[in-house]
Amino acid sequence: MDDQSAGKQYLDRADMALVEVINGVGCIARDSIVNTGTDILFLSESGVRALSRTIQEKSQPMRDISRNVRDTLVDQVSRADKDQIKAVYSDHFAFYLLAIPDEETVWCFDMRAPLENGAARVTRWNGLDHTAWLAFDGAMYMTNIAGIAEYRGFQDNGSKYSMQYYTNYFDFGMQNMVKIVKNIAATVIGSTGQKFVAKIGTDYEDIYTSYNLTVKDAEVSEYNIAEYNIGEYSGAALIDNIRIPAGGSGFVIQVGFESEINGGFLNIQQIDLYVKQGRLN
């Protein structure tokens, strides 16, 4: 290939043309823009958007990946310095991180598969003041006043950290009926002996009934007379199906889980709540 033909591989400004205008959506933070390889993500006035291109239809539908946390996210962004907002995408971890240093908050959007409403699963990391992020060679790096850090393991710089998850309030399709909670069940993947707390709340009251739970202990197997790794490897992944009696009643019910993470991990796969119908309102 000669230089003349090679040069034709690049876009000539004279060949550029406007194909489509997307109204009502614009990027408000330059460093929130990331290319995932199949999509472009960015922060707009209404939250995080994905410019998902459908080649077959020659269209560019806008996907609102922060729909489920829009109000909280937009409120934080409204107070923040937009020039300080940063974002990064990791193909290895399959997440998009949006960091708002002024709020000491990082929003983590799971990009593996969208939810039914098109939004992404999202968690919020609090108390983080990192100012720059880099995904490189399967690793994630970040900077703050203390230096350079790496995202890995299940501790926060050698210390434990708190994990909290709460559902929305739901009425089980019986809006005018009181629901009496009978049992709560959960399928979890976690480290052996990992402790966590299940919580039941009702009718939007800030009062919860707590139930202390523990991931089952792994059985220690011995090969001849030698114990393999002495049976003390706390990072072993276990699947545990937990079901316990629970209480509480109300028109709407909320379920929550809290845990202190300190070297082990906890992954909540499924939640089942068993209720009995009460009186008609």
Predicted feature residues:
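Beta-sheet repeat architectures centered on beta-propellers
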Residues: 24-30, 35-39, 45-281
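Surface-exposed extracellular loop regions of Gram-negative outer-membrane beta-barrel proteins
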Residues: 1-22
